[in-house]
């Protein structure tokens, strides 16, 4: 975005080769709108899988707990299930075409008045603006007040071949037993250069239990998954080594102010939380768009940074609060919250105007900071 405005942009990448890291995810209508602005939606859609609803049921009785349909939006638009490599490839290529300079094998650990310092102690020239997009454990954000709080629960995830029927290729599907067990399957399209369709499989797990899970071997765990959701048997057959499953560790923090002198913080570096509402990548894209728009509108840097912080404040705070509030209904010990979820919230969610409100919530549209959006 900034390079297309005619600015010289340098990206410092901590690894020797820039590459995607992480599970498949959902691009929500807010994130897709940013890609629309960049003219990149079509390239992502060619690799992605349209998702028109999110469905969750309780395992014992099959009670529907979650049923969110994007058709309930005033302006319906499906989400996309995306393999992380697909979005990376499209954005990386666009950056190179726009003239962005990428310096690899440079981990930046500090920023002061437009100058960056790397892990080896080397300093960069002074930049007009530093944008910290280095993730939830950013050392730059930590120096400006970010206090990352690890959450007790995370998830095991793996990329698998798409299993086909009876799984719905247009839905994120989840099955729960209480709030302590959850298994999900998300269709994520394909990787660049590989036509085979894929899924992201995930299993809720306390991070403290990860070592015990590995030590026990896959078969006892597979038996648990099959007992919860028998249809996953074929999918589980593709998992033969614990190393195929990666533990995602979740944490929560919200930076009090995402700006400082010649510094803007975006994405998980500014605000991270559980992915229960599926907003992480989309929030980062929104941050980038709002920041670029503020810089284009106002040549005065402090004023532009203040506008960025102001326009993102309430949207970020709302979704951070919603995520923190909803997560214990899906990832927690105890029986009270899942009982409320199964017997009360599930029924209330079917009463108007709840279906539209839920669709707007998971789409990221509540308090959307973009002035051109009308729901």
Residues of each region from the PLM?
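Glycine-rich phosphate/pyrophosphate-binding beta-alpha loops
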Residues: 249-255, 270-282, 314, 331
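Generic enzyme active-site microenvironment
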Residues: 11-12, 130-133, 266, 273
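Active-site-adjacent segment of FAD-dependent monooxygenases/related oxidoreductases
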Residues: 23, 27-94
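C-terminal helical "tail/cap" subdomain of flavin- and related membrane-associated enzymes
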Residues: 46, 293-375
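Glycine-rich FAD pyrophosphate-binding loop
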Residues: 3-23
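Active-site metal-binding loops of divalent metal-dependent hydrolases
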Residues: 15, 263, 269
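FAD-binding beta-loop-beta segment adjacent to the flavin cofactor pocket
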Residues: 249-265, 317-318
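Conserved FAD-binding catalytic core of PHBH/FMO-like flavoproteins
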Residues: 93, 98-100, 106-245, 254
